[in-house]
Amino acid sequence: METKISCKEATLADNASDILKSTTADNILTVPEEGITVTGILIGGQPQGVEWNFEPASSATFDHTIYDQEMNNGIAAKKSVTDPNYTLVLDNKNSSTADPKQSMVYVTVELENNMGDFYGAEGLIPKGSRFYLVGQLDPNASTATKPSGDPIDRVFVKDHTTVANFTITSLKKAYNHIPDLRTSKINVGLAVDLSWQKGITFDVEL
C-alpha cells in the first residue's frame, strides 16, 4: 500500500466544545511548518494467512492488523502532501460462499502531537503524546478510482498497489489510544482518496 498524508488547512479545530460540555469554543491549533510527525500506520482487515497463490483461504477471517513503524524519510502531515510511505500487505479477497461480500478496511495513522494540548474524540491529548486518526477504505466509494478495464472489487489485490491519500480535516475524531480496527463502531477522522495502480487509490479526510 502506498500512503500519503496532508492537512486540509494550516489550522485544525479540536473537540473542546463537545468534551467540556460548556460554552467553550473549540481550540484552533496551527500545523507546524515542519508538519505533524507521522510515527506509524496500522492497517486492519488482514487475513491470518494465505494459500500458495497468496490469496486468503475460504475459511479465513480478516481480523489481523499490520503495524508499520518504519516511516519513509520521517514523513509529516502538513498542507503539502508528504512523500509516500510503502507497506507490504496481503490480499484481502473474501472467498466465503456463506458471506461473499468484500469488506471495507480501516487504516489508522499514528502521529506525534507537536502542536499543543488539544481535545480529541474521547478527551485530552497532551502535547508530546501520540494520537490516532482513522480512515476507511471502501473499494465501492465514489472517491475510489479503479484502473480502466480492471475489475477490482476489494481494497487489497495481489500484484497491485493500493494508493491511499489521507487528508486531516480536523482533530475532533482523534483518539488518545490505538483504536480496535475490528469494530465498525469507530470514529472515522480522515478523508481518503483511494486509487489503484493495477490496484486502488483512496482520498480520505480525517
Write out the residue ranges for each language-model feature:
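Tryptophan-paired
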Residues: 1-158, 202-206
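Intrinsically disordered, low-complexity repeat and linker tracts
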Residues: 156, 165-206
